[in-house]
A protein has these predicted regions:
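Active-site-proximal polar cores
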Residues: 1-25
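Short, conserved turn/kink motifs that form compact alpha/beta structural patches or helix kinks used as
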Residues: 4, 24-107
Length: 107
């Protein structure tokens, strides 16, 4: 992987909890950082969810390794060109340790 292959901007978001006006806990998302990324789509699948077909679009996201990038967990998500990807695994370093790869799934 070369730095020039990172051609898409990805905003990584972590889950946050806050309280609404009624005091109820509300789940939301907070932007943590934005980085250049490469998306490599894997073979898509379909699954039956609640008696209807649901398509799945798994992909490998690659970003440059940094302290912020190493903080990403499988609870986070990435927003790329308005499309939301749930991070399915903690990032793992590439053999040269310059980049991190993670499995994500478009929702």
């Amino acid at each position: 992987m070369n730095a020039g292959d990172l051609s898409t901007r990805a905003t990584f978001q972590s889950p946050v909890q806050s309280r609404d006006d009624d005091g109820q806990v509300v789940q939301g998302w907070a932007d943590e950082f934005t980085a250049w990324a490469n998306i490599r789509y894997l073979r898509g699948t379909e699954a039956v969810m609640q008696a209807r077909m649901q398509s799945r679009s798994p992909a490998i996201l690659t970003i440059r390794s940094s302290a912020q990038a190493r903080a990403v967990t499988s609870e986070w998500r990435a927003v790329i060109d308005g499309r939301v990807f749930e991070v399915r695994e903690d990032p793992r370093p590439t053999p040269d340790r310059a980049f991190l790869e993670m499995l994500a799934e478009a929702i």
